[in-house]
């Protein structure tokens, strides 16, 4: 556990280090907001094999970290400040610090880079568009239309009534949306099941909304697409065919940053780290090694 200073006091966050490598330190930022590191345990085998030093970490408010009740804490800026405190605690710097964020973790990683890229060696954005309104539009105009009309209608009716506690809501979303676009494995991995069970629903709903189907919480208007050109460090943008995020938008983002590379996962979804694992991990490892060897420009 490491201490984090916030405007409303000091709290502790859970972090676990693997390996020792003064040249490569990777911090993993989970999604949600307020999921847990557990669904990112799949990096362990691959990163340890490469000899990377890396960190699993539960952001403040998540299951293994302190969970203060003050809702003023759940803002992007406050989370960015937290990541900077974590960086200092693990003694990472511009010569070795890589941030890999998935989903909400991708929002946090991009925002962190916009403020603190002078302290980073590389940025990896896994399955997160740089515009929440465009993500919402993709959910409405592309993904929703792939559902059977009667199922979509029932989901929309429940949403209109704000009846999110109704078990039917997840009953509909799980097979028709989550299994199509979140993780396509027939059997969901243990780590993902644990993370889903441990999500802090209060923070998730406040920031994201009631589900992964679009976005309606505090993050709904978030958009930094027109600022991506400010990111000058080597950056990997990862998209996947079946993702909740438009893979074409992910590719475009790789061109908007100064030193971008695009990784496409043809069999993957939002958690391509699980359902297109070989392509995903090979691409991520290749990128980190290339940045380390100064091959990304």
From Swiss-Prot:
GO cellular component assignments: membrane
Gene Ontology MF terms: aminopeptidase activity
Limits of the AB hydrolase-1 domain: 26-131
InterPro entries noted in UniProt: AB_hydrolase_1, AB_hydrolase_fold, AB_hydrolase_sf, Peptidase_S33, Pro_imino_pep
Reactions catalysed, as given in the entry: Release of N-terminal proline from a peptide
Disulphide bridges, residue numbers: none
Enzyme class: hydrolase
Entry annotation: catalytic residues: 103, 243, 270
Quaternary structure note: Monomer.
Family stated for the protein in its record: Belongs to the peptidase S33 family.
Protein name: Proline iminopeptidase
Protein species of origin: Flavobacterium johnsoniae (strain ATCC 17061 / DSM 2064 / JCM 8514 / BCRC 14874 / CCUG 350202 / NBRC 14942 / NCIMB 11054 / UW101)
């Amino acid at each position: 556990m490491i201490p984090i200073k916030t405007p409303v006091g000091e709290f502790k966050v859970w972090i676990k280090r693997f390996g020792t490598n003064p040249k490569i330190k990777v911090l993993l930022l989970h999604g949600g907001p307020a999921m847990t590191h557990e669904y990112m345990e799949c990096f362990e085998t691959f990163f340890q094999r490469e000899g990377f030093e890396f960190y699993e970490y539960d952001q403040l408010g998540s299951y293994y970290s302190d969970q203060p009740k003050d809702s003023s804490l759940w803002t992007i800026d406050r989370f960015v400040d937290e990541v900077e405190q974590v960086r200092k605690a693990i003694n990472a710097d511009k010569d070795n610090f890589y941030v890999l964020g998935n989903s909400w973790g991708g929002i946090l990683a991009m925002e962190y880079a916009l403020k603190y890229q002078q302290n980073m060696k590389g940025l990896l954005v896994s399955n997160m568009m740089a515009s929440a309104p465009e993500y919402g539009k993709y959910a409405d105009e592309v993904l929703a239309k792939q559902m059977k009309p009667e199922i979509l209608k029932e989901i929309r009716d429940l949403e209109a009534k704000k009846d999110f506690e109704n078990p039917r809501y997840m009953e509909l979303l799980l097979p028709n949306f989550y299994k199509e676009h979140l993780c396509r494995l027939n059997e969901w991995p243990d780590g993902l099941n644990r993370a889903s069970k441990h999500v802090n629903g209060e923070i998730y709903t406040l920031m994201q909304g009631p589900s992964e189907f679009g976005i309606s919480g505090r993050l709904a208007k978030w958009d930094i697409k027109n600022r991506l050109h400010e990111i000058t460090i080597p950056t990997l943008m990862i998209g996947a065919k079946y993702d909740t995020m438009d893979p074409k938008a992910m590719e475009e983002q790789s061109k908007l940053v100064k030193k971008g590379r695009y990784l496409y996962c043809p069999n993957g979804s939002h958690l391509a780290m699980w359902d297109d694992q070989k392509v995903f991990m090979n691409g991520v490892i290749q990128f980190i090694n290339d940045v380390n060897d100064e091959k990304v420009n």
